[in-house]
Amino acid sequence: MLELITDFSKKSFKNYSMKEELKFNAINIIYGVNGRGKTSLARGIKEIIEENNPDSLRYFYTDYIHELLLLEDSNKFKGVKATFGTKNVEIENKIIKLKNEVVDMTDTKKLLVEKRRKLRELINEIHKSRKGNLKIPLKSSNKSIEEVIAIYEKNLKDAKKIEHNIESIRNFVANDETLYNKYNSIYEVMIPSLKIETYDVDRLTKILQNNYTDIKIPSFEVIDWLRNGLELHNVEESICKFCGNNLNYNLIKEKIEIYLLNEKKKDFDYLKDVEKSIEQLSDNYEQYLSNIDIFVNELGVQKSVEESLGDSIDEIKRILKQKLGNMENDNLKFPSDDYITLISRLSEIEEECKEKKKIKLKELNKKTENINVIVTGSISLEILENQSIREELSSIQYEENECKKQEQLNEEINAKISKLHENQSDYNDFKIYLNGVFESINLHIRLKSDETTQNYYLYHDLENISLNIKDISEGEKNLIAFLFFYFELFEDEKQETIKSNIKTLIIDDPINSFDEANRFYVLELIKKVLKSKFNQIFIFTHSWNDFCDITYRLKGEDHNFYEVYKDHQGTSFLEKFKKVKTPYKKLFQEIYELSRKSQKDIVEEDCYYYHSINSIRRVFEEFLSFKLKNSDLAQKSNQPEIEEVYRKMTGNEMSNNKKIKLGSFLTIINVLSHKPYRAIDVIGSAKFLMRYIEDVDKAHYDAMKD
C-alpha cells in the first residue's frame, strides 16, 4: 500500500514530499478545483504503483474510453472476459451438428449462371439471324431472360398492330439499308442559324447620319440620374433636396443637355453589337449557300433568289464599318427597307429548312419504324415459339427456386451457429450483463459482438442501427467508460468477487457531463467500490458536491480526505480535511480566499482562475436564493432586481459607481463562464461579490467566511 510520496515532480507539483501526518490510507478521497494539479497527482500515483506491480492496478481517467477501450482506427470496443455461468460441452456438439446441415450452394449457383448465359446466347443468335441488315439491337445484356422475353412479347403485339397476318410476320425477311442510310444522312444535315436580333432601324439611321463632337461626359447612368433628380426641383430653388448643398438649377440643366446631346460612345457600342451580329449572320449564310443543293434536293426547300441576299449583307457590313471607322461621318444612309426584308427572309429560310427536315425525318422514320417493328415481331415470334427455350427457362427457374430455399435455410443455420459461438465466448457474458445494465438505466445503447466475438460495437436498440463513438453524447461516453471500468473489476455478475490480481484503484473524475439520474447511479457504484475489498483506493474529483456525496457517512479509520491546493507561486501541495463543509460554504470560502488575492499573486500558467468564474456565479445564485424566490436572477437583464435587494437590505440606494460595477460583474460571470479570460478580472469579480454580500448581509458573510 502506498503511504507517502516523496520528491514528486509533475507539472505544478515541484519536488513535493508528503508530511508524515498526511500519509495515505486504504481509502483516499481527494478534492481539487480544476487547475490545481489534481490529475497530475493521480497520474503520478499511477506511475509509482506501476513501477512495482502494474497488473494489480486499475486506473480510470478522462480519456479511458479512447485510450483503453476503443480499438485503433475503429469504433469497436475491446472485449472483456467474464464467465458468469458454466459453459456446456453440448454447445460444441450442437455447432458441429448444425454445420453438417449447411449445404454449400456455390457450385450450383455457378452452374445456373452458366445455363442462363447459354440460353441468352441462343436467344441472341436467333435475333441476329432474323434481323438481316437492319440495325435492330440486341436486348440489353443487363436484363434478365424473363425481362427479355417480356420485351419480345410486347414487340410482337406492336408488330400485329401494323401487320395483322401472323404468317406474314413469321415469313418477313429484312433486307433494306437504304432507308437507314437516307435517314442518317438527313439527320446529320446541320441547319445554320439565320435569325438575329432585329435592331431599331430608326436608331441605326439616326446614328449613321449623326455628326458627333468629342466631349468628355459622365456615364449615361449618371446622366439619367441627374436628369431625373432635376425634375424634382424647380428653377427658383437654391438648395439641393438630396444633399442640402447649394443648387444652381440652370447650370446643371445646361450640363445635362450637353451630356444628352453627345451620345457618341453609347452609339459606337451599339453599332459594334450590330456589326458583330451581322458578321455572324454573314458566316451562317455562307454555310447555308455551301449546302444549298442538300437543302433543295434532299429537303425540298424552294430555291428562288436567295443567293442575292449576300449582297445586302455585304452592303450593311460596309456601311457599319465606315461609320465605326469615322463616327463624324454623317453622309451614310442605312438601307432600312433592304435590312427589314433581309432579316425577315433569312428567318423564313431557316424556319422552312427546319420544318422540311422535320417532315422528311418523320416520313423516313415512319417507314423504318414499320420495317423494324415487323422484323422485330418476326424475331419475337420465333423466340417465343421455340420449345427448347421455354423448357430450358422453366428448368432453370425451378432449380433457382430450390437453391434460394436452401440458401435461406443456410442463413438460419449460420445465425444459430453464430449465436452458439457467442454463448461459447468468454466475452459474451460481460456483453449480456452490461446490456442489462443499460436497459435498467433507460439508456438506449447496446453492445453487439463483432465477427471475432471478442470485441463489441455500439448500436441503438430502438432504431436498430450501428453507432459510431461520435454519435453519442459526452455524458453517454463517460457513463459507458465507467461501466466498462467498474464491471471489469469483478469475477461475478453480482459484483461480490473482485478479480484476484486487482489490488489498487485510481479513479479520476468519474462523474462528468452526467444528468442527475446517471450521476446518482455512478455515485452508488463508487460507494460499492468503497465497500469492496481492495488494498487501496484513490478517488479524485473536481466537484465539491460529488466529494460531499462520496464522503457522506463514510466512517472508520481506514479513510482520509484531502484537498489539492496551490500556493502563491503556483506550486501544488496536499492538505488533509478535518471536517467536510457543505458545498455552498466550501465554494464561498474559496471565493473569499480568491478575493484576497491581487495582481502579484497571479501565476501565468495557473488556469485555476479561469475555472473559478463558475464558482463565483454559483455562490451568487445561491446567495440570491436566500433573498428572492427566483434564484435565476444572476443575469445582466435582472440587474434592477439585484439593486432592489441591496436597497431593501441596506436601506440605501446603490450608487451609480456600484451600479456600473454590478453590471460589469454580471456580464463577466455569465460570459466568462463559457470561455477563459484575464485572471485579474476573475479576482475583481470575487472582490465585488464579497463586498456585495458583506453589505447586504454581514451576519451571513461572517458565518460563511470563517
UniProtKB/Swiss-Prot annotation:
List the Pfam families hit by this protein, alphabetically: AAA_13
UniProt KW GTP-binding keyword:
no
Where are the coiled-coil regions? 86-162, 269-299, 337-427
State the SUPFAM superfamilies in the record: P-loop containing nucleoside triphosphate hydrolases
Fetch the InterPro entries from UniProt: CR006_AAA, P-loop_NTPase
Q: Does the keyword Cell inner membrane feature in the UniProt annotation?
A: no
Keywords of this protein's UniProt record, alphabetized?
Coiled coil
Give the highest taxon in the source lineage.
Bacteria
Q: What is this protein called?
A: Uncharacterized chromosomal cassette SCCmec type IVc protein CR006
Recorded source organism is: Staphylococcus aureus (strain MRSA252)
